[in-house]
A protein has these predicted regions:
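N-terminal nucleotide-binding beta1-loop-alpha1 segment
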Residues: 10-40
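A short, N-terminal amphipathic alpha-helix
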Residues: 49-68
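Short, polar loop motifs at secondary-structure junctions
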Residues: 72-78
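Short phosphate-binding loop-to-helix
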Residues: 81-112, 169
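Active-site acidic Asp-centered loop
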Residues: 115-117
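Conserved donor-nucleotide/metal-binding helix-loop-beta segment in metal-dependent transferases, i.e.
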Residues: 122-146
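Short, glycine-/small-residue-rich phosphate/pyrophosphate-handling segment
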Residues: 155-179
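Conserved alpha/beta core of the MobA/IspD/sugar-nucleotide pyrophosphorylase nucleotidyltransferase superfamily
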Residues: 174-252
């Protein structure tokens, strides 16, 4: 992280969200909704070496200082320079997301861009474009390759559009478009999110700078002996043969 980026991030960390803004200028926030990084890695059977693929800190460091970043996480203790940290609350994904949206609205933000951590191709310029398009649209959606969304931008005054959505059905994008009607939704370019090794293979074929890391991880997986591949593919990676060591690329 460069000096300028670090200064911006440090400023966000020590400064609470400011409620005084120029008249007519909307208050903007980025809502990052994510579990602890080790939980997200284990859920996908990804090794620690894949952490950069699920890292939102790089995007956060590029976002304009005028935009506050709020991380809603399941972690009991979380530090993220430049992020305002909140605990997720709710019985399921939908409730936790809706509660996060309500909290952001209570803090006085007019425009919100909600993202996760599983889209390595997401860039700060995508977030800036989303805020810009909210001037004329009810929603700005970033569709993923399966029909979900890697980004949802909305005005707090119209957050009811997000209530009752059947999330995680790969129909999120279609549901939200249907709710708004023609001409009220702006679509960003389709990007790939990473929920499985199959997604990593697709992502590795692209020209994103992180695609090289994806290729490296795939090469390490397929070069390993069969018994080690079985170990890597286990959901929580908790079982291993006595005295069996993980592949070098996956060592802690």
């Amino acid at each position: 992280m460069g000096g300028a980026s670090f200064s911006r991030a440090a400023k966000r960390l020590v400064s609470p969200p400011c409620v005084l803004v120029s008249k007519g200028v909307p208050r903007q926030a980025v809502l990052v909704f994510a579990d602890e990084i080790h939980v997200d890695l284990a859920r996908r059977s990804f090794p620690k070496a894949a952490r950069p693929l699920l890292d939102v800190a790089a995007v956060g460091s590029e976002i304009l200082a005028a935009v506050d970043i709020h991380l809603f996480t399941s972690a009991r203790k979380q530090t993220a320079p430049g992020f305002h940290i909140h605990r997720q609350t709710g019985r399921d994904f939908a409730a936790r997301l809706e509660n996060a949206i309500e909290r952001i609205s209570e803090l006085g933000y007019d425009e919100v861009v909600a993202i996760g951590r599983d889209c390595p191709g997401l860039r700060a310029i995508d977030i800036e474009r989303a805020f810009a398009e909210l001037a004329t649209k009810k929603l700005v959606l970033g569709p993923d390759h399966r029909g979900g969304c890697y980004l949802i931008a909305f005005r707090s005054a119209e957050r009811e559009l997000l209530r009752g959505v059947r999330w995680k059905q790969n129909t999120d994008c279609a549901q939200l478009r249907d709710r708004c009607g023609d001409g009220q939704v702006f679509l960003l370019p389709v990007k790939h999110d990473l929920d499985s090794w199959a997604d990593v293979r697709i992502f590795a074929r692209g020209d994103d700078p992180l695609a090289r890391l994806a290729l490296f991880l795939l090469a390490a997986i397929y070069a390993a002996p069969t018994r080690l591949v079985h170990f890597v593919s286990m959901a929580c990676q908790r079982m291993r043969v006595r005295q069996q060591m993980p592949p070098p690329a996956f060592a802690a």
